[in-house]
């Protein structure tokens, strides 16, 4: 789940791509300043389902994010542009990281735009699949956590992602009940650890 959160944070980089398909993708991403949605996620390995989860998310550029998993285990990830909190409810534990530290070194700043070199790490292609537009990002380096990322749009709306990692796992995320550019309260991207939980700083 943390990896998915990181890759989503990566999606809204402000860096300009040099390729035509990348410019089209960047234009779509730049049009999204805020966003809310419900998600369902399936992780597969060797064509077998490894895990399934669902929940809700909220995003505000630059760098603010909320990813709340409700099923099967409750987890909340909140980023405010400076720090990132990961609250595992069942473990009664909160992990706190500096946001750049928590995101850096992965394919992870595609969403928040902290890493200016990230957009040079992927080759971007585009194809139509019926009424959908699929952007296929392939890593130029074998060292990236995610070797391939697909972003699926219905017109200007991001409705899904497919993430391919180094271990051969595929994470399929579908977004529904999507709202683009709603006004969001600041408290969505703030977090105060509940009383009695362990707080681990990294």
Curated annotation (Swiss-Prot):
GO terms for biological process: lipoprotein localization to outer membrane; lipoprotein transport. The keyword Lipid biosynthesis does not apply. It is found in: Periplasm. Keywords: Chaperone, Periplasm, Protein transport, Signal, Transport. Residues 1-18 form the signal peptide. Its main location: periplasm. One of its GO terms (cellular component) is outer membrane-bounded periplasmic space. It holds the Pfam family LolA. PANTHER family: OUTER-MEMBRANE LIPOPROTEIN CARRIER PROTEIN (PTHR35869:SF1). Participates in the translocation of lipoproteins from the inner membrane to the outer membrane. Only forms a complex with a lipoprotein if the residue after the N-terminal Cys is not an aspartate (The Asp acts as a targeting signal to indicate that the lipoprotein should stay in the inner membrane). HAMAP family: LolA. NCBIfam families: lolA. Monomer. Belongs to the LolA family. This is Outer-membrane lipoprotein carrier protein. It comes from Legionella pneumophila (strain Corby). The lineage of its organism: Bacteria, Pseudomonadati, Pseudomonadota, Gammaproteobacteria, Legionellales.
């Amino acid at each position: 789940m943390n990896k998915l959160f990181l890759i989503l944070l990566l999606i809204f980089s402000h860096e300009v791509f040099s390729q035509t398909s990348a410019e089209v993708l960047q234009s779509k991403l730049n049009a999204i300043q805020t966003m809310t949605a419900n998600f369902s996620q399936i992780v597969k390995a060797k064509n077998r389902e490894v895990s399934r989860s669902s929940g809700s998310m909220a995003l505000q550029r630059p760098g603010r994010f909320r990813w709340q998993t409700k099923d099967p285990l409750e987890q909340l990830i909140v980023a405010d542009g400076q720090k990132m909190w990961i609250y595992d409810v069942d473990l009664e534990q909160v992990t706190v990281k500096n946001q750049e530290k928590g995101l850096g070194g992965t394919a992870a700043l595609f969403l928040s735009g902290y890493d200016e070199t990230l957009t040079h790490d992927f080759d971007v292609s585009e194809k139509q699949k019926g009424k959908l537009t699929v952007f296929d990002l392939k890593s130029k380096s074998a060292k990236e956590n995610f070797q391939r990322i697909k972003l699926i749009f219905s017109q200007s709306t991001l409705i899904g992602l497919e993430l391919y990692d180094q271990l051969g796992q595929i994470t399929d995320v579908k977004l529904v009940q999507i709202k683009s550019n709603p006004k969001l309260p600041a408290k969505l991207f703030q977090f105060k650890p509940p009383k009695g939980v362990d707080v681990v700083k990294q």
